[in-house]
């Protein structure tokens, strides 16, 4: 009996122990992260079943009970919703399409089985034809969806905030206009006409726009996966004709090949850059044919950059070389991929001609006039490179540089855009002279947000277009700030005077013989060369933008057009914005208020030369040479004087008078009066004669006594 009781107690103890262990195991599994996720998935699956099944279904109770029992709940009183009739069970194809496309856009939720197109790659290794949709019957002229005119004063109104429709800034600008009347000369308002069309892009991600050089063709690129290249043609009555829609990988850069280039003989060729490290040369068929587009050449950047050096596979910037680049083949393609600069030859294989790593490079620009010269925006500075040299660069120090562009009509002007996303620093544009890198020529301020695009005008060398995230498109006029100057040029130079002297002697070759010799001898004595202004010169006034277009959305890309709309005498600017709209803007080029307009008039060319005493001057200059100045060509320099007295250091000075020169046959535009000829007293130079020189250098005391030649005037030729 005792043995039976002991066995029963042992059994009860083991049962209690097993129950205690089961509770501990249940507590551990219930509080673990994996169990919580499983419970959540069971609850979610339970709700899905209870929603999609009808309560009248006899198998409803069983299915619901199974789901709720797995969750540990009762089945009584469970409320269910009727199953929708249009419900479709999710298939494997839909799941792939959902994860392969962008889920934010409703058009991407459709599967390939519903649209009738299976998942396939647009490009294959042995398939060099892109898919284009061209239906001659569906080609029709598109009318603009909006047409408005923007009237702005100079300086322009402050940029508004577009968080909510608030136009109080217009009233404030009108109140400020009265204060500006005393400072700036008022001019009539400038009207900017804008037309816009909605591009049928499903992704709503327009990235680039390009305008043909000789024909009214516009190419618009999108970052979508299909149907992302649109080709349009502008008509005379401000209409737009849609010709083709082509499927390429996500496009981030477009450039039309110039008709003057060798490859362009095949037809309309478009250079494209994509987000997968590829660049193409695409041959577009005739606009009124149904032939597909053809890829002439493909450039793969991934094969030439190691994986560890690859920061981004997106190619945003590409450019084509000009005929001035004699070191490369005509129509060579330059691209920027993951801080590496590539130069491709379309006639060669898949190997680039040149590869150069540029640290922190975000954008670049090729010089259209100088062979091998490249400017790269590298964040904290702008780097000037010569691709013909193995290494070496010149840096222009200016922070937050994200864009740069060489002027297509001036070989020395370079524009850089500086933007700060954090808003701690200003957003501005700086104009540089590539020959003088000490500091910028001008600083253009006015944008309140990041600058997205930078484009020089194709008609005026002094006009610059910029667009920003603040919703403004601005036209800057720096004509009075960077005008044509008299030769020798009037620049502030702080470098080596000896090198500057050699440069002046070379620039003096265009003068007549006697005047050229006078200038070269004057340079030997003058402490400040002739083309250096006095330090106490007047401070340059800031350049103002002449017109602007205020939009509700930021412009993603800007391109200067080579055509003018009907009824407008101003060039056009083509833009694409973030909402999928294409805009054509006619922006007038007004004269800034802070300068006086130039009045062309015919002037008499006179000579004004500063003379210096020299022992060898009597032997070099004769009366015949001096009188020859009166018989020179009409291109006598207006900066030279009509009469000068040359005095030697001998007791019997030789005097000669040059008669007045003939009137010039060309017209000049002068904004300030000429200074009269300088009357310089007799000076005797002292000191040792330098080797290799035919004149004596004056002493330091006499050198300081020499006055500086003040040539502070504006001179330019007009047609």
UniProtKB/Swiss-Prot annotation:
Entries under PROSITE patterns matching the protein: WD_REPEATS_2 (PS50082), WD_REPEATS_REGION (PS50294)
Keyword Repeat: yes
Pfam family, one: WD40
Segments for region (Disordered): 1-144, 677-707
Record keyword Nucleotide-binding present: no
Entry keywords, A to Z: Cell cycle, Cell division, Cell wall biogenesis/degradation, Repeat, WD repeat
Annotated GO MF terms: histone binding
Compositionally biased spans, kind Basic and acidic residues: 691-703
SMART domains named in the record: WD40
Biological processes, Gene Ontology terms: cell division; cell wall organization; chromatin remodeling; regulation of DNA-templated transcription
GO cellular component: cytoplasm; nucleus; Rpd3L complex; Rpd3L-Expanded complex
WD repeat ranges per the UniProt record: 201-242, 246-294, 310-354, 396-442, 446-486
Protein role: Involved in cell wall metabolism and required for the separation of the mother and daughter cells.
Family: Belongs to the WD repeat DSE1 family.
Protein name: Protein DSE1
């Amino acid at each position: 009996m005792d043995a039976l009781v002991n066995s029963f107690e042992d059994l009860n103890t083991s049962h209690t122990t097993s129950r205690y262990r089961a509770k501990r195991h249940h507590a551990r599994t219930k509080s673990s992260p994996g169990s919580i996720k499983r419970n959540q998935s069971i609850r979610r699956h339970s709700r899905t079943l209870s929603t999609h099944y009808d309560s009248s279904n006899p198998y409803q109770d069983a299915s619901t009970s199974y789901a709720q029992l797995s969750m540990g709940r009762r089945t009584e009183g469970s409320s269910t919703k009727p199953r929708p009739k249009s419900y479709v069970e999710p298939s494997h194809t839909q799941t792939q399409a959902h994860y392969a496309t962008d889920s934010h856009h409703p058009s991407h939720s459709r599967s390939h089985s519903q649209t009738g197109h299976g998942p396939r790659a647009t490009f294959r290794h042995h398939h060099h034809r892109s898919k284009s949709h061209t239906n001659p019957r569906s080609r029709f002229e598109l009318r603009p969806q909006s047409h408005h005119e923007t009237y702005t004063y100079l300086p322009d109104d402050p940029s508004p905030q577009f968080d909510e429709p608030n136009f109080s800034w217009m009233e404030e600008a009108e109140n400020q206009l009265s204060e500006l009347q005393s400072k700036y000369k008022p001019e009539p308002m400038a009207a900017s006409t804008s037309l816009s069309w909605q591009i049928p892009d499903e992704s709503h991600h327009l990235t680039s726009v390009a305008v043909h050089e000789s024909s009214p063709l516009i190419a618009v690129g999108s970052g979508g996966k299909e149907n992302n290249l649109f080709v349009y043609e502008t008509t005379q009555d401000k209409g737009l004709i849609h010709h083709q829609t082509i499927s390429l990988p996500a496009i981030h850069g477009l450039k039309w090949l110039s008709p003057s280039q060798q490859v362009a003989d095949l037809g309309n060729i478009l250079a494209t850059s994509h987000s997968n490290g590829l660049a193409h040369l695409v041959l577009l068929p005739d606009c009124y044919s149904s032939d597909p587009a053809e890829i002439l050449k493909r450039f793969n950047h991934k094969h030439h950059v190691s994986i560890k050096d690859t920061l981004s596979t997106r190619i945003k910037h590409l450019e084509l070389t000009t005929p001035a680049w004699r070191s490369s083949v005509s129509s060579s393609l330059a691209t920027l991929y993951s801080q590496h600069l590539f130069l491709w030859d379309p006639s060669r294989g898949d190997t680039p001609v040149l590869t150069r790593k540029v640290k922190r490079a975000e954008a670049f620009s090729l010089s259209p006039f100088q062979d091998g010269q490249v400017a790269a925006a590298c964040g904290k500075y702008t780097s000037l490179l010569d691709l013909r040299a193995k290494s070496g660069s010149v840096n222009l120090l200016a922070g937050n540089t994200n864009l740069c562009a060489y002027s297509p009509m001036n070989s020395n002007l370079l524009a850089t855009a500086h933007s700060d996303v954090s808003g701690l620093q200003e957003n501005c544009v700086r104009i540089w002279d590539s020959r003088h890198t000490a500091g910028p020529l001008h600083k253009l301020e006015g944008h309140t947000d990041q600058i997205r695009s930078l484009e020089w005008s194709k008609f005026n060398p002094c006009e610059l277009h910029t667009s920003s995230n603040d919703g403004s498109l601005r036209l800057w006029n720096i004509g009075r700030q960077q005008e044509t100057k008299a030769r020798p040029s009037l620049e502030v130079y702080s470098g080596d005077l000896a090198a500057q002297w050699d440069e002046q002697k070379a620039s003096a070759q265009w003068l007549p013989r006697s005047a050229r010799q006078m200038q070269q001898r004057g340079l030997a004595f003058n402490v400040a060369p002739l083309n250096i202004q006095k330090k106490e010169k007047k401070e340059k006034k800031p350049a103002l933008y002449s017109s602007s277009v205020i939009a509700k959305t930021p412009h993603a890309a800007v391109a200067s057009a080579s055509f003018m709309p009907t009824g407008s005498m101003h060039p056009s600017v083509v833009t694409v914005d973030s909402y999928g709209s294409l805009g054509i803007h006619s922006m007038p080029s007004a004269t800034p208020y802070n300068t006086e307009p130039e009045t062309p008039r015919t002037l008499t060319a006179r000579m004004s030369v500063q003379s210096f005493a020299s022992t060898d001057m009597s032997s070099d200059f004769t009366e015949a040479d001096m009188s020859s100045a009166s018989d020179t060509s009409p291109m006598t320099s207006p900066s030279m004087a009509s009469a000068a007295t040359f005095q030697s250091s001998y007791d019997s000075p030789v005097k000669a008078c040059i008669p007045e020169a003939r009137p010039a046959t060309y017209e000049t535009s002068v904004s300030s009066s000429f200074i009269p000829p300088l009357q310089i007293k007799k000076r005797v130079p002292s000191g040792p004669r330098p080797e290799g020189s035919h004149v004596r250098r004056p002493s330091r005391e006499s050198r300081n006594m020499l006055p500086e030649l003040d040539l502070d005037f504006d001179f330019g030729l007009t047609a």
